[in-house]
From Swiss-Prot:
Interacts with AVR-Pik through its N-terminal part containing the HMA-like domain. One of its GO terms (molecular function) is metal ion binding. This is Disease resistance protein Pikm1-TS. LRR repeats lie at residues 681-706, 708-731, 732-754, 756-777, 778-800, 802-823, 824-848, 945-968, 979-1002, 1004-1027. Gene3D superfamilies: 1.20.5.4130, 3.30.70.100, P-loop containing nucleotide triphosphate hydrolases, Ribonuclease Inhibitor, Winged helix-like DNA-binding domain superfamily/Winged helix DNA-binding domain. Residues 191-264 are annotated as: HMA-like domain. Residues 1-190 are annotated as: Structured coiled coil (CC) domain. Constitutively expressed. PROSITE patterns: HMA_2. SUPFAM superfamilies: P-loop containing nucleoside triphosphate hydrolases, RNI-like. InterPro entries: Disease_R_plants, HMA_dom, Leu-rich_rpt_typical-subtyp, LRR_dom_sf, LRR_R13L4/SHOC2-like, NB-ARC, P-loop_NTPase, Rx_N.
Amino acid sequence: MEAAAMAVTAATGALAPVLVKLAALLDDGECNLLEGSRSDAEFIRSELEAVHSLLTPNILGRMGDDDAACKDGLIAEVRELSYDLDDAVDDFLELNFEQRRSASPFGELKARVEERVSNRFSDWKLPAASLPPSSVHRRAGLPPPDAGLVGMHKRKEELIELLEQGSSDASRWRKRKPHVPLRIMGGEMQKIVFKIPMVDDKSRTKAMSLVASTVGVHSVAIAGDLRDQVVVVGDGIDSINLVSALRKKVGPAMFLEVSQVKEDVKEITAMLAPVKSICEFHEVKTICILGLPGGGKTTIARVLYHALGTQFQCRVFASISPSSSPSPNLTETLADIFAQAQLGVTDTLSTPYGGSGTGRALQQHLIDNISAFLLNKKYLIVIDDIWHWEEWEVIRKSIPKNDLGGRIIMTTRLNSIAEKCHTDDNDVFVYEVGDLDNNDAWSLSWGIATKSGAGNRIGTGEDNSCYDIVNMCYGMPLALIWLSSALVGEIEELGGAEVKKCRDLRHIEDGILDIPSLQPLAESLCLGYNHLPLYLRTLLLYCSAYHWSNRIERGRLVRRWIAEGFVSEEKEAEGYFGELINRGWITQHGDNNSYNYYEIHPVMLAFLRCKSKEYNFLTCLGLGSDTSTSASSPRLIRRLSLQGGYPVDCLSSMSMDVSHTCSLVVLGDVARPKGIPFYMFKRLRVLDLEDNKDIQDSHLQGICEQLSLRVRYLGLKGTRIRKLPQEMRKLKHLEILYVGSTRISELPQEIGELKHLRILDVRNTDITELPLQIRELQHLHTLDVRNTPISELPPQVGKLQNLKIMCVRSTGVRELPKEIGELNHLQTLDVRNTRVRELPWQAGQISQSLRVLAGDSGDGVRLPEGVCEALINGIPGATRAKCREVLSIAIIDRFGPPLVGIFKVPGSHMRIPKMIKDHFRVLSCLDIRLCHKLEDDDQKFLAEMPNLQTLVLRFEALPRQPITINGTGFQMLESFRVDSRVPRIAFHEDAMPNLKLLEFKFYAGPASNDAIGITNLKSLQKVVFRCSPWYKSDAPGISATIDVVKKEAEEHPNRPITLLINAGYKEISTESHGSSENIAGSSGIDTEPAQAQHDNLPAVRDDYKGKGILLDGRCPTCGRATKIEEETQDRVADIEIQTETTS
C-alpha cells in the first residue's frame, strides 16, 4: 500500500511523486531558488501535503465504488494541478544558473492553490459512493425467452451432460477457445457462399487466390449463373475477416449462405480431443462457470436451473451482491438460500433468522440449518457471481455432500476463484464460457436489426454495419444485444462513406457510459471495474491506449507502467499484470509450450476508453475519432494514443494543445503526409513508436534534438532505423531504451552518457559487440541482447553493480567473463541456446537468489549453496587468480541441466588437483574427469569432504578394475553420477548411506556380469541409465549392465526402485515391483528429448587448447573422446543458434 500511495494514479495524478520532487528541490542548496520562489514552493508543498494526507486513506485505501470521488471537481483540480506542478519543477531544472536567478516558476501555481484548493478543502467531504442499480445487485427472474438466447443450446447440452454423466476429461477444465474457434463439431465442416460482383476472370482469380490463402479453407470454387458467387468449404474459417478482405481487395461482398457439410474429420477431431483419463469417468458434483462480464454466465445458469429443476427435491438460485470485501450481505444470502430450499418441500417455512444473536453467530446458525435441511435431499444449488473466495467458503460449508445426486452450479468472472475451486475440490469441473461463433453472433445482431425494422436501412455488402458490430463484440452476447440495439438507434445517420461509418461506430463505442440503451452493458462492466483497487484501475486505464485489434506485449506494457510512474519495480508490475489476468480484464492465449500473447476484449477497451476520458487520463485518437471534439476539450491532453489511420496533420492544423502531454504512444502506421510534429510535444516523458515503419534515422535524430531533456522511455522496436545517432547522448534522463527488432548493427559510444538508463533492450538486432562505455551505466538493471550475433561480453559488464537481469539467450556467446561474479545484485541470468556450459567459479559469490536459465528449458539452475563465504575466506589472494583454471560451475553437462549448478574441474586429470584438495574441501558438489582410475587417496579425500552432496566422476578410459566404494565416508552424499564407457563400480555394505540417486552415462564396452551392489545403498530411490546417442541400448556392455541392475533392483529392500532408461531422445520410466515385467526391455526403449542431445554434451574449453597448460596431474594424452564430443557439440550449437535466429 505504501508503494501504491507514492505512485501516479488516475485519481490523484502525480500528487504523491511531485511532492517528493518538490521537497528535493527545496532541500537542494544548488538550485538557486529566489526567496520569493522558495516561499511559493513551500506554501504549495504545505497545502498539497495536507490534501494528500486527506485523500490517501479515503481514496487509495478504498476498494469500493470510489468512482464518484475520482470524478469530483475538486479532486480533478488537484489532479490537474499536480501535473502542472510536475512540469513546472522540470521546467525550472532545465534553466541554467543565470536563468534560475531571475525565474519565478511557482507564482501562478500558488495562486491556483489558494483560489481553487485551499479555500475549498476546509469543508470538503469525500463524495458518497454511488451504488449500482438494484437490478445489478440482485438479478432475480429470467430474461424473456426470445431470440436473444442465440448460441445457448449447445452450452446447455454440454453442461447437462456434465451434471448427469460426469466427465472423462482428466483436466476437469473446459478451456475457452480464442476468438473465431475451430468449427469442427460432430464431423461437420462449414460451407460459405459469398456473392461478389466480378466483371472478368482477373477479378475471379484474385478472389479465389485470396480465399485459398485463408486459414482453414479446404476448397474454393466459382458458381452462379453470372459467375459471381464464391463457394468455400473448410473448417475454422474466420468468415467475418474473410468477407472484409474480399470487400477491400475485390469488391462489395455479402453472405448468401452459411451451412454445414458432412466430412470425415476423425483425424482432426482426434487431435483436438481433450486428454482422457485412462480408465476413469469422473462424477461432476459442482460446476464452476467462468467467463467475461456479458459472456452469458448468468443466463446459462438460469437456463440450467429451469431445465433441470424438476429432477430435484429442492432448488436454489441466489445472487451475490458485489462488494470490495466479502459481502456484508452474506447472512442475507444464506437466509435467501434457506428460504428457497424449503419452497415446495415443507408447508410452513422455517424462519431463517430463528437463531439468536447477530453477526457470526447468526451466520453459523443459518449454515447449520441449511446443512441439516439439505442433508437427506437431492438438491440443485445455483450461486451466481462469486467475487471473493471467502464468500464461497462460507456458502460451501452450508451445503452438505451426500450420495443422493445433489448438484452445485456457481458462476464467477475471476480466474483466481475458478483456479482455487479446481485445486481444492476434485469434484469441481470448470466450464469456461466461450464467445459465440461468428455465425451465431451474426444471427443475433442481424436478428435485432431486422426485428426493429431497420434491416432494410442498414444496407448490404460493405455498408452493412452489423459486420463491424460482430467483429468488435468478439462473440460477447450482452455486447451484441445492446450495441446492435444502439446501432438501430443511429441507423438513420449512417451513410456509405467508410470514414463516416467508422465515426458513427466510434460514437457508439465511446458512448457506452452515456447512451441510455447501453446502460445494462455499462452496469455489467462497472461491477468489475469498481471491484478493483485504485492502483489496478490506473494500470488498467492505461491499457485504453490500445486498439482492440492490437495484441498486448507484456514486457512492453509493464515497462511503460514503470516509466509513467505508476509502479516502481518490474517485479511488482509483473504481479499486477498477473492480477489483471486473474480478474478477467486481460486474456492470455497460448500455454507453456507455445507463444503467449495477451489482449483485452474490444468492448472492455471501449469501456476503459470512456472511463479514461472522464478522468482526462488518456486521450485516444484513431480512424473515426472526432478531432473537433478533442480540439475543443477544455482540459489539457496529458497522455495521447495515436492509432493506425489517424491523420496526424490534424495535430498541427487544430487548436489541440499537446504542449503538456507527457506520454505519446503511436500504434501502427498513422496517416502522415508531413509526419508527427514532435516539436509540439514540449514535455514528453514517454515516447513509444514501436512497430511504426515510418520512423527512420532522420526522424530519430530530430527526436533526440527536440525531446532530449525529459524523455524517460523511448520505444523504437520494429522501426526501420539503422543507426543510433550521436545525439542520443542528449537524452540525459532516459531510463528505458527499446531498439529491438531494428536494423542497427552497433551501439554508439555515447550510450555511456545515458547515466540514468535502467533497461537496455537490443534483442533481434545485428549488434555484434557491446561498447566498453557500457560500464558507465551504473543504474542499469536489465540488459537484453538475445538473438544477436554477439559472441563475447566485455569484462566491463562486471562494473554494472545494479544489474538484476542479463539475457544473452540465442547468441554466439560461449563463455562469460569472470567479472560476472562481481554482479552482487544479479537475479536472472539467461544463457539458453548458447554455448555457455559453465560459469566462472566467482559466480558462486553472487546472491543465492540468482536463477540461471540454461539449455532449452525454462527451469532455473540454482548456484551451489553454503560455500561462498568459505571460498572467499579460505583462498589466499595470490592463489585466487589461478582458481579459474582449476574450477568452474557447470550449468549444463552430459546429464542435462542440473537443478543445482555443480562445481567442475575442467579438463582431464590423472589425479585430483592439489589446489582442489588444499582449498576446496568445503564444496557441496564436484564434477571431475579422471583418465582411467580413482586413486585410493583421492577417494579418501572425496569421502571426507564434509559438505559433499553431489559427485560426478567421469573416466576418459575404461578402468581396469572396478572402483570399490566401502562403508567409510560420503555421509552427506545424495547424488552420485558416473560417466564411463561401461560403469565399472561396486558398492560394499553401508556404502554412501544417504545416497538417493545413482546415475550412469555410458557408451559401449566389454560385457560384464559383475555385481554392482546397489542393494547395499540403503537410501537408494532411483537409478538412471543414460546411453550415448551414438550407441544403442542393446549393445552388449550396456544391456548386460542394465540386466544386472534390474536383478539387483528386484532384491533391494526399498522396493520399488525407479529405473529410468533411455537411448538418446525420449525417456521411459519403469518401476521394479519384484517382477521384470515392469521394467522396459533395453531393445524397446525410445530416445530422450531432442533438446537433451546437445545439452548433454561436454563443455568446450578454449582456455587449454594450444596454451600448453598442464595443471596438477592433468593427462595431456587422454582427450580423444572428449574432443570428439566437443566438436559434435559445436556443430549442434551452430545449427541450434541459426535455427533460433531465423525463426
